[in-house]
Amino acid sequence: MHVDSRGNAPVRRRRPAVACTECRRRKIRCDQATPCRHCEKAALRCIYNHLRPNTSQSKISPPTSASGFISGSQLSVNDSPQLPLSNDTKFHGFGSGSLKSDLSLEYVPSALPTSSSIFVEPNSLSSLSEPLAWEIAPPETGVGILAESDSPLNMQGQTGELRDQHTAPWMEILHCDPDEFWFDSEELRRMWRKTRDLELLLATSKMPSEWLYWSPGPTAPEASSLIPPRATCDVLLELQYWSSPDSMSDVFLCKLLLAMAIGTLFAPASPSAGQLTDMRPRALAWMHYGQQWLFRKIVLDAQLNLDILQTSPTSIGDRHFWLSEDCLVRMAMKLGLHRDPHIHNPAMLGTEVEVRRRLWVTLLELSLQASLDAKLPVPLPSDGGFDTELPSNLSDTDLGSIATLCNPNPRTFFTHSTMQILLAETQRIRIRILNLLYSPATSIPYQEALKLASELRRACNTNLRLLQSFTPQTPGAMMPTEFQTKILDLWTRRFLLALLTPYADEARSDYSLYYTRKARIDASSLLLSYPLSHSTATGPSPIGSYYLQLQISGQGIFRNVLKQATAAICQDLIQELVEDAFPVTDREPHAKLCQIIRDSISIYRTRMELSQPCMQEYVAFVCASAQIGALRSRCDNKHDFFPTAKKALGQCHHILESNHRSNSPEKYRAETMHVLDIDQGMNFWSDLLSTAGASPLSPPSSSSFFLEHGLSHTVPWEAPHSREVVDNER
């Protein structure tokens, strides 16, 4: 659409071209089949959304009725019990990254809006403060969309096809770009944009890390002054620090503070904890102190070489705290860790041999997990490319400066290295899976996939049974915990889920692949279940809440597994309900799967209450649960997902708006600065350069993203000339 040289009105297309999104993107002719020939040949998802409105140019009018939020849907939310979440988990997530709102190295918003109106002052809603045109009901206590009863739900409509789950609306919500999603309903589009803008506001401006930088001069606090009282330390961490605290070095104190920051995630509320009522600002202060301590060492030791400072990967204020796990593997290969010392260096001490084996297993495991998250092949050949043997089954106390190690313990004896050994035993299988799945121009035959899946599944089940069979050999001997068992199963079984997914998706049209669907349901259920113990002991595990806290606050693996496994269960359960092949034998398993979905929705709701960006997943899975509920209650083939999506979006907006008003960034800034005992008006860069005697040149700007996109986002420590650069870029 354009305006010609004569000034005539823009010409609109009378009829939009009917083509799937992939054909439109590739600018090729679409045969309008489902799926079309090009998408089927390229193994792409064929989606027809030619009715998508041009949201950037369309004028959104308020809905005609503001009271239709609840009346539009009769979906009742059951008072199903919530997950046992403790009230002391307001500190959400610990990561070694930019330490912003989510405190995670791995979280970066998938896409930031190109409108500078979103980046407003943190203490005001600005453009988001306008009253919404829909009525927002306060969130209910439960998420029982998956009603256990067989009462018919009011799901009549023409929006979502129950019998065509491949293009179901909830899958569109889950896999779309959250900043460009479309709805047929103009009201839903407006609700989505408002809620998404509020989520981005909380994610991008909730905890600007520039506020927490201070000078390395005499005003920097001592590490010992940040150590909390002993009652608090004993709850967060068990260390022999109090025997001689004055003799501890700053390096040890920084490590101690960071370890206690991790402990705040798992520490339960107790009267003896003293100051554990709200440890979030204190934990933030500890992490920022460790970050700045390391930064001061780097800067001062480098004589303030500004060239190095400008290109440092730990640039101030940005999310550039990134270290590739592939670099660790290649570094290990340069050190020769991938070659077994007994073969290539027989004269090496036994202790050093054991340490090198353990280090290689650790670095390789990090690379495998990162490759799976990034959907990339492993930087190793399929045959492994290494001959390092497995670590010996020895405890740390058995290692010493001796030429030869003692005989390793039998496999039935649990030691410090047992978990590493079990992980290492499946590494070669997982390397083959990753290279077959993600290597270019490589397709994995179905029989080969079944063989790998069977091999990995047997290994996972064998490891699970082994950990559950350990018995104390001596009084006080080490025993695997439920948490360790779950982490081991999580790190290995998630590869099985990735291997089965391509074939399970095709099982709806090819019944010869039915086994992969059942196997994926089983793997997803185990990934979302905790604890994994099959014993008859009654009562919850004493550490039963640890993994739940990681599901709520964790990023990376924990976030990805929660999303992928829940989506797989929703998709496969919907397809099984559509086929209704085994109505008698599947009734009880389907009820258990519905409970797993309810638990996942509860976790996403709690993540959102802790300002974790998960609106897209929450809305998608609530809509999926509504579709499952309609199928279980034998509704018609069509249902209207509009009331469910509208209700879920209203709950998201209510939660996010409450978070923004109650937990403003100014509040966190004041609390954290108070813990650090720092002047809030301090200019980090001027003090830093004046301390070192350097000229006050421009620091590396934390507004690199906004400069690149022509946005204005000034920060408290920006020098006047750096603000001029921002204005010029605009």
UniProtKB/Swiss-Prot annotation:
GO molecular function, one term: RNA polymerase II cis-regulatory region sequence-specific DNA binding
Pfam families hit by this protein: Zn_clus (PF00172)
DNA-binding region(s) from the entry: 20-46
InterPro entries, sorted: Fungal_TF_Env_Response, Zn2-C6_fun-type_DNA-bd_sf, Zn2Cys6_DnaBD
Tree of life domain: Eukaryota
Signal peptide: none
Keywords assigned by UniProt, alphabetized: DNA-binding, Metal-binding, Nucleus, Transcription, Transcription regulation, Zinc
Predominant location: nucleus
A single GO BP: regulation of transcription by RNA polymerase II
Compartments, record wording: Nucleus
PROSITE patterns from the UniProt entry: ZN2_CY6_FUNGAL_1, ZN2_CY6_FUNGAL_2
UniProt GO cellular component terms: nucleus
PANTHER family: ASPYRIDONES CLUSTER REGULATOR APDR-RELATED, HEME-RESPONSIVE ZINC FINGER TRANSCRIPTION FACTOR HAP1
Function comment: Transcription factor involved in regulation of gene cluster that mediates the biosynthesis of aspyridones.
Protein's name in the database: Aspyridones cluster regulator apdR
Organism: Emericella nidulans (strain FGSC A4 / ATCC 38163 / CBS 112.46 / NRRL 194 / M139)
